Amino acid sequence: MKKMSLFQNMKSKLLPIAAVSVLTAGIFAGAELQQTEKASAKKQDKAEIRNVIVMIGDGMGTPYIRAYRSMKNNGDTPNNPKLTEFDRNLTGMMMTHPDDPDYNITDSAAAGTALATGVKTYNNAIGVDKNGKKVKSVLEEAKQQGKSTGLVATSEINHATPAAYGAHNESRKNMDQIANSYMDDKIKGKHKIDVLLGGGKSYFNRKDRNLTKEFKQAGYSYVTTKQALKKNKDQQVLGLFADGGLAKALDRDSKTPSLKDMTVSAIDRLNQNKKGFFLMVEGSQIDWAAHDNDTVGAMSEVKDFEQAYKAAIEFAKKDKHTLVIATADHTTGGFTIGANGEKNWHAEPILSAKKTPEFMAKKISEGKPVKDVLARYANLKVTSEEIKSVEAAAQADKSKGASKAIIKIFNTRSNSGWTSTDHTGEEVPVYAYGPGKEKFRGLINNTDQANIIFKILKTGK
């Protein structure tokens, strides 16, 4: 065996030392980075809160998140799954019951009022207590503090949840009156809502009153398409993109903005106020799909809501003075991951849908053959029995019958369970990000959320 040279001998001794030094340096660098990140997060937690964004997935209980997570993983359930944007900020759970002598499960009006005002009330009530007395909302408090305010929804903008933040009425059914109040009610001589984006055009362009004209005369821009919304930069805007609610996300055309489009547009406008802003964003139609027990439609809306939520979080990360709270006002439908005594849920059929059952049913009611519609929009190998079931349902009840039959195909194929066509009473998840997020930990009441926000708006903490 050859003797090592002096240089080789030194090299053999120094290499392990160098490796240890590099490893040690890496460990210290990693530890230092972690400490820096923790310090940055701690500093953000103590930062002044200038902006509050409340995001409500109407009807979005925990099973919807579980199903959507499975879809993000292409139907698999790996040990380390891809998380939803919500999962990263799970903070606690929230009770949703109303203060109603006849019901112990809430509707969206009572739940919205509790979330907006900190006061529980009866089902159907908008911004009033159980005796019909007006109660202040967090949006109104924000405007009183000189902040800008906004409401965004995929329902009519005067529907129950947004209305609870911006109006006061003994019944959610008085939608003309609620629309009127958006124009008529003022705080310190100013309109209390600066940005209104959603559906409901028919309630603002009426024979008895043209509210769109009044908003324009008051200095608001009025837009009706995605392109006009993006082009317009005014701080006050009324955007109405459908006569009723918007089409579901899976069915929308290029002229209709997504919930993300509307959320980003609202934030861009409201953020011009140095005093800050309050914004409520609702993914309204998770609930609507759930009332129909429509898994395809519900998942389409959860995805739309997640994209809007992600945009709000991205803004908050850069701004560092924004608190984002996402939750549901209640859950709907008794949706279950698995049914019929089988320990499986299959995301693949839901992922295969290119349009909602409602959209497909409309095409069938217009005279398109069932087989052709399902082949084009369902991307499933549909059986002859399934085709016959839709044809029979369409003959009996046209569009509604066809929609129910198509929904049944997707629910059977995915093994999705539903126990109700109405709301259910279980607690809902709360997701919080930004300074003040720790205030929403654990099990809270829906009224707690409003009371915490009231304090933040008054103190910045």
UniProtKB/Swiss-Prot annotation:
Belongs to the alkaline phosphatase family. Gene3D superfamilies: 1.10.60.40, Alkaline Phosphatase, subunit A. Monomer. Zn(2+) 1 binds at residues 287, 291, 423. The active site is at residue 108. GO terms for molecular function: alkaline phosphatase activity; metal ion binding. This is Alkaline phosphatase 4. Pfam families: Alk_phosphatase. It catalyses: a phosphate monoester + H2O = an alcohol + phosphate. Residues 1-41 form the signal peptide. Zn(2+) 2 binds at residues 58, 329-330. Its EC number is 3.1.3.1. It is an enzyme of class 3 (hydrolase). Keywords: Hydrolase, Magnesium, Metal-binding, Phosphoprotein, Signal, Zinc. Binds 1 Mg(2+) ion. Binds 2 Zn(2+) ions. Mg(2+) binds at residues 58, 161, 282. Its cofactor is Mg(2+); Zn(2+).
